[in-house]
């Protein structure tokens, strides 16, 4: 709905215009009025740690001249889409319900409960009264404009991933394993939509490949090639390699730059951690196998991309969170924009 009300898909300027308002609450803090992607957002008077914002937009309807009266619909869906996009673009939490923001962003009270709260897993995103600069608001506007300018299918693909990304944050207090897997789902969904990688024999698991190569020596070459062709069509192999190639291809060099007080994943560790994240998601999806104990502990996550255990490297929740943000942002700006007047 948010994309539709911009008038992008209408072929006539003969329209009804409906000035609409809604309220969103957030831990993000800024003042004034901002125009961002066909929407105005204005800070309202705040009486607590969570700030209210008035969202204003024009819910446009093209006149049909059919003799039937058109009824304005979709305000709830518009706010749902907007809260998710703002949450992603401003790296914060937006919601129609103030108590939801307070619950997600709450701090752990001393001596209460042994389970960590979401804010202990990721740094900055869930800070109360998180200051947002003018430049950050402008960047948010640029992102929203780019997203709204995509064709309908691309817009829905990206929006669905952003919704899943935000759902992952909300799941942190309930099930860290599911929250972690949800981030991997985001990457998988994008990979399946935008990558057409075709696996080759060298992609096959090394141990199985070596064992088969010994058997192949006893078979004629033509038969060997046919068998290899069947094996590399294995769906799991295809999905796994597509996932890896897509993510690596949408992570820029700046992602690996040094940051003070944070352990950043190295380029040589990245693919190993990525493969492990994919396997963790697979085990959770098929066997409900939870994350290893260390990855469920917030102290390993907040200020480090990766955790090393038994000579292996794993993404922490916050590390994987950074990867997903990077990939969603980069794929959004890599997609072609379509002009107004395009068909749905």
Task: Specify the residue positions occupied by each region the protein language model found.
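Amphipathic, oligomerization/interface secondary-structure segments
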Residues: 21, 149-344
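Charged, non-catalytic interaction/linker regions at domain boundaries
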Residues: 1-181, 185, 306-343
């Amino acid at each position: 709905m948010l994309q539709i009300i911009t008038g992008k898909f209408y072929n006539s300027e003969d329209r009804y215009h409906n000035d609409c308002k809604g309220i969103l609450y957030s831990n993000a803090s800024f003042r004034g009025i901002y125009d961002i992607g066909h929407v105005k957002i204005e800070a309202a008077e705040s009486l607590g740690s969570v700030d209210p914002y008035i969202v204003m937009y024009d819910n446009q309807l093209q006149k049909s001249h059919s003799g039937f009266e058109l009824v304005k619909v979709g305000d709830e869906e518009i706010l749902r889409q907007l809260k998710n996009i703002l949450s992603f673009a401003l790296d914060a939490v937006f919601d129609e319900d103030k108590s939801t923001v307070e619950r997600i962003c709450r701090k752990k009270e001393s001596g209460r409960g042994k389970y960590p709260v979401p804010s202990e897993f990721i740094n900055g995103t869930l800070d109360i009264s998180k200051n947002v600069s003018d430049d950050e608001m402008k960047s948010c506007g640029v992102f929203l404009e780019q997203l709204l300018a995509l064709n309908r299918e691309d817009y829905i693909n990206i929006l669905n991933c952003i919704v899943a990304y935000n759902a992952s944050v909300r799941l942190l207090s309930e099930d860290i394993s599911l929250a972690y897997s949800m981030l991997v789902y985001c990457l998988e969904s994008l990979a399946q939509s935008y990558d057409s990688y075709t696996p080759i024999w060298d992609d096959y698991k090394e141990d199985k490949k070596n064992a088969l190569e010994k058997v192949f020596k006893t078979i004629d070459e033509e038969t060997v090639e046919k068998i290899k062709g069947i094996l590399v069509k294995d769906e799991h192999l295809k999905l796994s390699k597509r996932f890896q190639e897509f993510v690596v291809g949408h992570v820029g060099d700046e992602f690996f730059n040094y940051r003070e007080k944070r352990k950043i994943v190295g380029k040589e560790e990245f693919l190993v951690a990525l493969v492990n994240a994919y396997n963790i998601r697979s085990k959770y999806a098929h066997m409900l196998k939870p994350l290893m104990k260390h990855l469920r502990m917030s102290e390993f996550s907040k200020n480090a991309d990766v955790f090393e255990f038994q000579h292996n490297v794993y993404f922490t929740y916050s590390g994987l969170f950074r990867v997903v943000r990077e990939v969603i942002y980069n794929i959004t700006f890599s997609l072609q924009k379509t002009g107004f007047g395009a068909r749905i």
